[in-house]
Amino acid sequence: MREVNFSIPNVNKASVNITTTLYDRRALDCTSTLPLINSLNHLAYLTTSSARIRDILTVDGGIERLVCILKEGRSNNLMEMWKWSLAFQCVVNIGVRGSENVRTRVVEADMVPVIATILDNYIKVMDKVRARSDSEAQRHRHHQLHHKITPTASDSTSRSSFSDASSNEQRTSRRQPPPTHIEIPPFFHDTRAVESNAADVPSPPRAPMTSPPERSTFGQDTYAHRSHAPLRHRAIQPLATAIPSMDAADGSGLRPVRDTERLPSMLPAAFNELASQPDSPTTPSGAGHIRSNVHVPIGTHARPPLSQHQSTSGDSDDANGEDSIMADDTGSGQSRRPIIGLQSRMDIDDDADRQTVIDSVTDSSHDLTVTDTTSDGQESETFNITHRSAVDGSIITNDNAQAVNNANSPPIVPSPYSLYFRDRTNIATQNFLNTMPREEDVLMSLQLLAYVSKYCNLRSYFQNSHFVPKLKIDRELRMLDEGASPVELIEEEDEYLLPDDVNIFPLVEKFTARHHSKDMSYWACVVMRNLCRKDESRGGIRQCANYKCGKWEEFTRQFAKCRRCRRTKYCSKDCQKAAWLYHRHWCATP
């Protein structure tokens, strides 16, 4: 039988195509993939911009043809995937931008089973990935625990041998006479070893330095004319509550001292040695910077310079002293390493946390990380059709991609499940990624449902639906199991033989949970609120919001409303308790 590729020889075309200025229904019957993709690409533009094209598609069988393309299923072939994505985009454009009659025709063209299958596939993928991620995380924790226990035993053995050796050395050293006692001033607390030539360096005379508890003041020129000796004694003065006595030659300007710089005793005990360096302005001989011979551990957190601090008092700080410090550092040509200060950033407290961060940075694979997001303050009746979608069928994975013409829309974040499977490189996983529903497909499905579900006369299509066999991914999900044998191809059942026993509202309600993206949760909440609309054609009665019940009111205001959202109605307390598991996610106060 000849293919249905209508050629146009007079314009040198192998088949009939849809362009941005010409719509031809025959182009949708083309069996060749490439010209059909070109036609669908232009049709996606026409369905967005032309209301007449949307109306024509509802009467010439164009919508039915697009739905048939969708029901053929997705394939691993890139061209087939592109064709499916473009057809889906066209149907969404028709349903979202069309009138009530156009939306009714989209539902009557059997588009609801396609949406139900997409949502069900996505939920199954999430459950599968969450289960695998939890098992892998548990195995990783057991491995880390075993890895930590083994070095601990070896360290205890080495420590015991080292203690024995040191005790033997102490026994031999006790035979020597004790060393001569050397008097050390009480304000010197440096415990580090000093070079031999440091004894010849005379220490400057030290005046008793005290300061009030609130603020300490001293001359700002004391930093300027200090001699830059290669080695200084590091000391710290005890704080007292008196005004320091200073010479007039030291400088007349006074500079306020901040509490975070004046209280080194608040530092952790592990850094007392570093904190005892004379960097605080309360120490008269403390230098404003550290020399190159002072070794600071790499793992310590450097305190920002004084110019980055904000004043803790209402007065303005004088920056001349700080400028002179910066000039000294620049002119000396030596590296400036500030000592450790109070922790004001996100620090790592212990070795366990540090190792966890290092492991997370060095780990090249992506684990499942579900972000807890909420969507507050959104109106239930507000619709937004400006979410960006792939008109050309390409997969959008840009973290900073914003919705078109919508500044308030959050950025589209790549799915953590796609990142999880992308790093597990095997044949089964790569084939599964091609058939896995994308987040934009789920988002457009929920968006289309939000527009067509508000018509109560179409509610039976949503509550009595089915799944499309060629779109289901149960076989691909079974291939992801570890040690799974190849699944034999089973002859699929005909779709028209399947019973309509699927209610789409429970599937949509699962997307109102907080671990989904904000856009998904928003559109899912809109769909669920449409379920609570009253049917004007039946006298304004409402249906019980518990999908397992489905009872209708016999008269208006028979059922009681939810006290929180004042929108949903339940026929009894039992139905309300049964539905609260997911209703709490979309139960918003009016």
From Swiss-Prot:
Amino acid composition bias (Basic residues), ranges on this chain: 139-149
InterPro entries per record: MYND-type_zinc_finger (IPR051664), Znf_MYND (IPR002893)
PROSITE patterns, A to Z: ZF_MYND_1, ZF_MYND_2
A Gene Ontology BP annotation from the UniProt entry: positive regulation of flocculation
Residues that hold Zn(2+) according to the record: 562, 565, 583, 587
Ranges for region Disordered: 133-220, 297-344
Molecular-function GO terms, alphabetical: zinc ion binding
Keywords: Cytoplasm, Metal-binding, Sporulation, Zinc, Zinc-finger
Keyword check for S-adenosyl-L-methionine: no
Stretches with biased composition (Low complexity): 152-167
Disruption of the gene: reported phenotype: Produces partial defects in sexual reproduction and suppresses an apsA deletion mutation. Changes the colony morphology and inhibits sexual spore formation.
One Pfam entry name: zf-MYND
Biased composition (Pro residues): 202-211
Zinc fingers (MYND-type) by residue: 546-587
UniProt subcellular location: Cytoplasm
Major location (coarse): cytoplasm
Function of the protein: Involved in determination of the onset of polarized growth and morphogenesis. Plays a role in the regulation of branching in hyphae and spore formation.
Annotated family: Belongs to the MUB1/samB family.
Listed name of the protein: MYND-type zinc finger protein samB
Organism: Emericella nidulans (strain FGSC A4 / ATCC 38163 / CBS 112.46 / NRRL 194 / M139) (Aspergillus nidulans)
